[in-house]
Amino acid sequence: MAPNLRKSHPLLKMINNSLIDLPTPPNISAWWNFGSLLGICLMTQILTGLLLAMHYTADTTLAFSSVAHTCRNVQYGWLIRNLHANGASFFFICIYLHIGRGFYYGSYLYKETWNTGVILLLTLMATAFVGYVLPWGQMSFWGATVITNLFSAIPYIGQTLVEWAWGGFSVDNPTLTRFFALHFLLPFMIAGLTLVHLTFLHESGSNNPLGIVSNCDKIPFHPYFTLKDILGFTLMLLPLTTLALFSPNLLGDPENFTPANPLVTPPHIKPEWYFLFAYAILRSIPNKLGGVLALAASVLILFLAPFLHKAKQRTMTFRPLSQLLFWILVANLFILTWVGSQPVEHPFIIIGQLASFTYFTILLILFPIIGALENKMLNY
């Protein structure tokens, strides 16, 4: 009998072992769909991004009008742009839900997979930030100015670092061209890191809602989870296309319809919604360096998750106190997101400070304490 090409060919064998004959826990819920959804997001963003890059001009005098030209004169240019801009929002929705799932079900105990995932999040944030600068509207320009300026808080080398990043003494043409180069490069870096992420995941196999070893029960990925993933794709692409076609500017800032002007500061400088929680934490500390450190810590704290796990059970499925704390954390993140979009005035300042304090307290102090407490309760 001739050998099965799918199982013998060096390249097809790898694809087969990753997507077809992969042993998968039978009880993984819809929360395990977000990994593949992120893959679809990445592919969609790279495709629409390539098509947009073909019509974009990375020059301060032409960038804004080249984007307008794409929307007006290129066949379906408006659709490509709207899908790309809103696709970024869906990318972040999926990654935040994916991280939340990992946190709830203790997936961070696969340390390598978790750490590469956090690096992926940081790369995605960098990509989204440099991408937001490219249309060269008011919020693009001032967002770039404010965020790059944060590096000047680094003692001794800060100012030099900022001028080196800018390619001059302010955000100008060199900044725009290098941001375009970075925005083109980073998604391919994300794709490469994704393969590393998957390699580490397939070393251990997937976690499951019970957090127990499921080797004896595993089923093949295809057809069960390929079909489940296709359902996930349709359920994500439907709201994405709806948003892109019916209200494409819902999540954008109206300021960005005004071309960048270094002489006029917008009354309200704020990032896109997916950065607002971190922006609120940054603003809650009146000291520049302190704010920058808190901003960095708000995301880098994820690296500590495996070390803060004190419970005997892996997942929160049977840990009601941890569940309560988890949902308080989620609510707290919503509050931070809302505060980040508000002006810096009373009562938003104090709300932001309390929410930021709560965020770090829950993650660093309360989760380990509750985990240890639940261990004690198991003995009674």
Curated annotation (Swiss-Prot):
Heme b b562 binds at H84, H183. Pfam families: Cytochrom_B_C (PF00032), Cytochrome_B (PF00033). It is a multi-pass membrane protein. This is Cytochrome b. One of its GO terms (biological process) is mitochondrial electron transport, ubiquinol to cytochrome c. Heme b b566 binds at H98, H197. Its cofactor is heme b. It comes from Procellaria parkinsoni (Black petrel). The gene is MT-CYB.
